[in-house]
Amino acid sequence: MKNLTDSFVYLGHWPSAGSFGFNTDILATNPINLSVVFGVLIFFGKGVLNDLLDNRKQRILNTIRNSEELREGAIQQLENARARLRKVETEADQFRVNGYSEIEREKLNLINSTYKTLKQLENYKNETILFEQQRTINQVRERVFQQALQGAIGTLNSCLSNELHLRTINANIGMFGTMKEITD
């Protein structure tokens, strides 16, 4: 694995006449360096990302199944309410003389309460799906960022040797000495 990483590092490493640092200008960045970074990100992040997406998919599907079961229960309640409504309507025909307005109120209350229950269940299902999608997207973003950061740190650590560290330290000490002479 280290040899594979080293080969990518050597492909993307060109000796520079200037200084060592990150190039933040994306248009001036070497396409080989970009392809190496993307290759490392894809290679290391693919398995973790697939597992994470599969887990999220299962959770979302379970939530949808639960919501569908709740919906079916609400539909069953609606069927029961309709049966009850038919029963109330036949009783209303029998008792029309005594209390037609009271029966109408009960019917409307029953329909309104059933409608509100269905609406609440539908809203809950939609909110749950949206929440799970947002949470999944955020976790995937976080995981990809962590993988990219770990890959970049690993690549940097494998590229830097003790000799390069010493040369960098000596060059910085020399620059600070020159700056001190200029300010004195």
From Swiss-Prot:
In plastids the F-type ATPase is also known as CF(1)CF(0). Pfam families: ATP-synt_B. One of its GO terms (cellular component) is chloroplast thylakoid membrane. It is found in: Plastid, Chloroplast thylakoid membrane. The lineage of its organism: Eukaryota, Viridiplantae, Streptophyta, Embryophyta, Tracheophyta. F(1)F(0) ATP synthase produces ATP from ADP in the presence of a proton or sodium gradient. F-type ATPases consist of two structural domains, F(1) containing the extramembraneous catalytic core and F(0) containing the membrane proton channel, linked together by a central stalk and a peripheral stalk. During catalysis, ATP synthesis in the catalytic domain of F(1) is coupled via a rotary mechanism of the central stalk subunits to proton translocation. Component of the F(0) channel, it forms part of the peripheral stalk, linking F(1) to F(0). The chain crosses the membrane at residues 27-49. GO terms for molecular function: proton-transporting ATP synthase activity, rotational mechanism. The keyword RNA-binding does not apply. It is a single-pass membrane protein. The keyword Cytoplasm does not apply. Belongs to the ATPase B chain family. This is ATP synthase subunit b, chloroplastic. PANTHER family: ATP SYNTHASE SUBUNIT B, CHLOROPLASTIC. F-type ATPases have 2 components, F(1) - the catalytic core - and F(0) - the membrane proton channel. F(1) has five subunits: alpha(3), beta(3), gamma(1), delta(1), epsilon(1). F(0) has four main subunits: a(1), b(1), b'(1) and c(10-14). The alpha and beta chains form an alternating ring which encloses part of the gamma chain. F(1) is attached to F(0) by a central stalk formed by the gamma and epsilon chains, while a peripheral stalk is formed by the delta, b and b' chains. It comes from Nasturtium officinale. Keywords: ATP synthesis, CF(0), Chloroplast, Hydrogen ion transport, Ion transport, Membrane, Plastid, Thylakoid, Transmembrane, Transmembrane helix, Transport.
